[in-house]
Amino acid sequence: MAIEVKNLEQLKSMRKAGLVVADTLELLKRTAQIGMTTLELDEIAATNLVKHGATSSFLGYHGFPAVICASVNEEVVHGIPNKRKLVSGDLLSIDFGAIIEGWHGDAAISFGLGEIDPADQKLMDVCEESMWRGIAAGKKGAKLTDISAAIEGYINSQGKYGILREYGGHGIGSAMHQEPHILNFGPAGNGPEL
């Protein structure tokens, strides 16, 4: 596994891209309304990219036709924005990536619109907390799969939730997807030292 190690200047460029991603995701969360379409949200994100002098990590990536991935309700990941109108109770997950100075930023956000079923809100809360547990486990001296174990451990402690084994986290830098691939499950203590 070859992990691309970044120097301080490269990290500064990545931070710029990450700030564009954060700004855009917050804009989309504030803007998303019942009756809008995910295609309209994609247009808002594209405009914000231009405003920041960034380009899309997603548009054209393996033929992807949009700047955001927008998954509604049971759509798992990488949904293509479309003309379906959002309704009260919808769960929306938006994944977004930006490039500045050749360096990528990439993140996702999930939220509900209108009246959210408490069970759906709990699902989103468990997912978010598992992410924070994984981040906390990724400290200096830890092993890569300590992150995986922290995510899985928290999800399992919450009872009835499963883990999609086909998806996980990834490194990022001069390409959107880089080593290491970070599973959301597995035993601690394996992989490269962080």
Where are the predicted features?
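Active-site neighborhoods and metal-handling regions in enzymes and metal-associated proteins
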Residues: M1-L194
